[in-house]
Amino acid sequence: MTVVMEQFHGEPPHLQVVARGLTEAGARGDWYAREILLLSAAGKVWQQGIVRIDLDQIDPATAALIRQARLPLGRVLINAGLLREVQHVALVKVVPGRHLATLFGGESGRVPAGSRATYGRVAEISLGGVPAVELLEIVAPQ
């Protein structure tokens, strides 16, 4: 949804990592996960996301860029020229709990007035025909 956010807001998003984790390589691959916010240059939250990616499905240079967490995952994959197919998309209505409300509304943990519910998607992204990314993206209430 990186490109959609760029087009809608008229500027590239800034990335803020809320949390991250890396599992050791094993039978299920080398998985990297993170929770992020996409923000405007002024710091307004546009979107919250949680993503898990099988780093074994991409080249080492692209994996390093993902771990650096300077750009949204979508932008890294696009810049790397990887063939992406978004599939198994489910749209969800979300009523933010304390954690998400805090991310969207600041320290008070309050969602902006009149915005109790918001929407997002759950999806899987295949890279070169192989399932490699699982994601949840939730748009911040306006």
Feature-to-residue mapping (PLM):
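Composition-driven recognition of glycine/serine/threonine/acidic- and proline-rich low-complexity segments
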Residues: 1-142
